[in-house]
Amino acid sequence: MVQGATYTKSSTFFCLFSPIADEVVLCLYDDGDCGKEKQTFPMIKGQGKDKDMFYFRAYGDLDGTYYAYKIIKDQKAVLSHDPYAKACGVNGNRSMVIDLKRTDPDGFENEVIPEFKSKTDMVITEVSVADVSSDESAHSRFPGKFKAFTEKHIMDYFVDMGVTHIQIMPSYDFASVDESSTRKQYNWGYDPYNYNVPEGSYSTDPYDGAVRIKEYKEMIQAIHKAGMGVIMDVVYNHTYDVYGSCFYKTSGNYFYRMNKEGYSDASACGNEIASEKPMVRQYIIDSLCYWVREYHIDGFRFDLMGVLDIETLNLARKELQKINPDIILYGEGWTGGESTLPEDKRAMKINACKMNGYGMFSDDIRDTVKGHVFYMDEPGFVNGADGKEDDI
């Protein structure tokens, strides 16, 4: 079964993986914030190999309708947004049914995507969406927003630098910024909440689930028109927290690695994702492929890639290359702490030979050349440190 909300003009098919639920109720809303539910439908529990799936087909044109799942276990109920949500309301707590065709900017479906055959010739710059245009010196009409990338002088800045690819720091929906607040806020965004939805604080209207999608696509289109590629920074190694996550609400601890003390924490963020489990693996692959198909992403930078397992990433590469044979894949080949996943299964630098098609950052070269990233009293080669020649 295809998970999430699959839209057609005549009906929408809802499907959720929930191995912990006794019952699941689909709740529909007119708004994505705090309005009362307008309809509820008990979902049908699957049988056999689909015994952990719940599904329901709602008839009528539901484009723009918000929804949530009521998970009932042991006669206790909790509301959750959809892990497979493609759109959502403000702060991501309610998912939204969306006709994605209406979010395409003019010409987006058939846009010309720049070709970059030689990955060794790439010149990549890392940016935060907020940092690009928030300062007054940027003279942007859309400070801190996706739409700032559609302004010619912003794109000219990157072109003049000689950049071939823009690596965008987390731009999916993250939990550390209140999208409903008008006060200035800032966060890098390594706090995943909705993996398949753009961040609302970077849109001009976080309350309308379609706006952030269209403006994200406009950003991608503008970068491509300027002759550059887009690399998306993705954080599949952990969630913002456990108990507020849709993974936990719908699936308990299934999505997380556990140890004797509780949650394994190789991310150093309080939890780590169990990428080796079948439904988690499928989720990560589905998510990556969705961003490439729907948003024309050219590549991915994996945060703490060493927390993820090798097999999942190799399978993801194969699926991604079916969509784009020149897909760009690289990441941090280390963890932020000890993991319950055996080291020989981790996507780390030491296992790079098992991961064809992936590049890895080298913190060793970085520290050797410029000095230790954390300790000022450990200089590097360019600062005159002795004994670095062999390392170089």
Which residues are covered by each model-predicted region?
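Short proline/glycine-enriched turn/loop motifs at strand-loop junctions of beta-rich domains
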Residues: F17-E23
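Core domains of carbohydrate- and sulfate-ester-processing enzymes
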Residues: T65-F116, S176-D191, A226, G244-G262, ...
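Substrate-binding/active-site clefts of carbohydrate-active enzymes
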Residues: S128-K152, D156-Y295, M305, T312-N324, ...
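Structural beta-strand segments of beta-rich domains
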Residues: S10-F14
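The feature marks proteins involved in alpha-glucan
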Residues: M1-K9, K36-T40, G46-G144
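Beta-strand signatures of extracellular beta-sandwich domains
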Residues: V25-C27
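Conserved alpha/beta catalytic core and glycan-binding cleft of carbohydrate-active enzymes
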Residues: N91, S95-R102, R317-I392
